[in-house]
């Protein structure tokens, strides 16, 4: 594949990172110059690809802390919830994301269905302004823990480029499933809790 320009090459690599698996991305990357690999868009794609590779089902969760991530502005870590003896469904979302907001009623139903069981939901707001997140939280009335102002930290660590991104963690913090949407969320939670 001939890539005539730096910009064109960056776009090809970035687009490929969204549409192929991690091994195919690595193979495509091996065919480009070091100059292209060092460009900011390609470095971002490499970060996301590495995060995806490191966080497949069976991998232990990677912690992060958001300094003002609680609604009251205090620090909060993913490990405050994940790896503490409960199944945890983590929903990465943003106030401006229509599919994210559209999925909230289904997550509310799951939360209600499994209340009192060994199950928790945590929402993590990414790529969003604090005020917009707080307004959406007021509108949506999600009764589970919230981490806000996370920006790109989770997407870089967990290797995702689109939201909603829903990941189910086991009680010890191992990833059970990721990239969950719609009925797949219900099925993954039900299967995990039946064990």
What role is predicted for each listed range?
Residues 1-8, 12-13:
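Single conserved hydrophobic/aromatic residue that forms the stacking wall/gate
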Residues 89-90, 121, 166:
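Hydrophobic beta-strand anchors of alpha/beta hydrolase catalytic cores
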Residues 138-142, 149-193:
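Thiol/disulfide oxidoreductase modules built on the thioredoxin-like
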Residues 109-163:
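Conserved segment of the thioredoxin-like fold in thiol-based oxidoreductases
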Residues 92-109:
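Conserved redox-active cysteine motifs that mediate thiol-disulfide chemistry
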Residues 86, 91-97, 126:
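Aromatic-flanked redox-active Cys/Sec active sites in thiol-based oxidoreductases
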Residues 25-60, 64-66:
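Long amphipathic alpha-helical scaffold segments
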Residues 65-88, 157:
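A short beta-strand-turn-helix
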